[in-house]
Amino acid sequence: IKKVKKILEIVCHNCSKVLADTSDPEFVAAINTRDPKSRFNRVWTVCKKKRRCENEDRQNKDKEEEFAPGLKQPLAVENHGGCGNVQPAVRQAALQLKAAFEVVQEEGPKRKETVPITPEMAHGILRRISEEDLRNMGLNSDYARPEWMILTVLPVPPPPVRPSISMDGTGTGMRNEDDLTYKLGDIIRANNNVTQAIREGSPQHIARDF
């Protein structure tokens, strides 16, 4: 969950683009790091401070044209190409992630609003990250896509891995199921309850309670 939190602090929650770009010298130095693990941590250090996904046209924003010595053409300015959305501060509380926004009020000071980041929301953000951004972050798009860190399909171990246990130790008396089997049964029952709630058109908060 800590890795997912860091990735959510690197990318935009709306368009899934990395919040920094090559106009930032620190970001350029970070993505040129050879070791993928160190590259990820350096990119995270640069991006976690940013609170907005840039969408301004830097070429038109600069009124004064910049020229390189000895060149007649102005230097090309690469735009970030983001969506302009304000980014929340991601907070971890136990096994939950929350997004903290600063809401500007018409009268009075700013107030902070906290919204839970559900697994569905996080999975959608991580799934949209481009392969180029994954490489810049130090992740392998073939073996370490970030959305794979969130379980959508639960692997069930076969019965030999979770054998039933004899209560009296003789092997002939009453037997009890392994703890893992009980937990898998709880998960299946919860999934069935969610499916039934969705089929019956129940409100979203009821399905979320399961």
What are these regions (language model features)?
Residues 1-210:
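Conserved core architecture of multi-subunit DNA-directed RNA polymerases
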